[in-house]
């Protein structure tokens, strides 16, 4: 009697609206490529979250400050260095952050505010009119970054960006502060640094600027590098993040249907699958512009996390050798958006802000709950043909024994890729029982097709691999 191995890294089914084949992505489960028990990998629950300390409000931005060797967070109306308050931050929306030797900068409400380490707060403004230095139309700050002793910021609604003075960071450069990304007439959406370049992200192009090395007063300090220009734009100010020694970003509708790309050697390489692009396509341009991208690394996972208004998507570079590996994160037992955001390695813990409550949490690897609430984990197998076959012994390898009480796994089957039937409950975890089998002995007769869904609701970590079924 043949034994059929069933992959669980990505399920396959149909969309009931248009009958197209779609991927069923793992929910709250990460794929780990590692040879174990006749499998090429296993799936592990995303780490749980426990409360670390209270904050003033929800998370608005985070940066690791290398000058102070501390994590700076903007939560609610406050800027925090670790747990201690540093100053007040206006507004309630997302903020841009950068830091230097003498100050931590926050771009908020159209201003670049510098919180100096000596306790003073300065806002970038023009030199005094009687100084004799050029007076610039600074406008409103959209995004900020820092490179080689200077802050750089983009002017909202224009293709101009500015740099601060070397001696006094609270003023523009006294001789040549203003530069233009002339391929972006609609304005610079975001700005960043890569190696020794200033990177300006527009809606249809990404431009790079390098230092000229000029020392003459009034000479241009930066010049565009057309050989590195990328013919794609970003969807929103925070729809970009450094990733894999380059930048990952969500593209703007101006260059076609949006997707997720990684920049490499002046080219943008797509990493999104068709199912991911369908999720992204379900958002309007205005909704997409509110997206936030960030990176997270632990246990050899190189994660790119995309926070959208109704989804949190995760791309794992370490598991994508045989094709892009994506999963979905969520909170609760329904389809609530994942609450964690702004992950940062702090001390020997990974800390995170929160989208809904005024707390900072930390990831904990021996649980899968979020703030002591059970979470749902979903895995799917592909549809496969089993014409008029009888099925027995559906078995999943599970690493068990760490639960506080007996957990059950809910198994259900589909014969059309759309509707899943009644769930079969199987005990899959029990305290101190480290070799428990997860086995459904009699599945039944299959007319033509079958696929399975595995659902676990628990506070304990979940480790599953090696799904197989016996056919006759």
UniProtKB/Swiss-Prot annotation:
InterPro entries: Phage_P22_Gp10
Pfam families recorded: Phage_stabilise
Keyword terms of this UniProt record: Late protein, Virion
UniProt subcellular location: Virion
Function: Acts as a tail hub by assembling onto the head-to-tail adapter protein gp4, generating a channel that is sealed by the tail needle protein gp26. Together with gp4 and gp26, gp10 is required for stabilization of the condensed DNA within the capsid; perhaps by plugging the hole through which the DNA enters.
Subunit structure as annotated in this protein's UniProt entry: Monomer (in solution). Hexamer; assembles as a hexamer onto the dodecamer formed by the head-to-tail adapter gp4. Interacts with the head-to-tail adapter protein gp4; each gp10 monomer contacts 2 head-to-tail adapter protein gp4. Interacts with the tail needle protein gp26. Interacts with the tail spike protein gp9; binds six tail spike trimers.
Protein name: Tail hub protein gp10
UniProt organism field: Salmonella phage P22
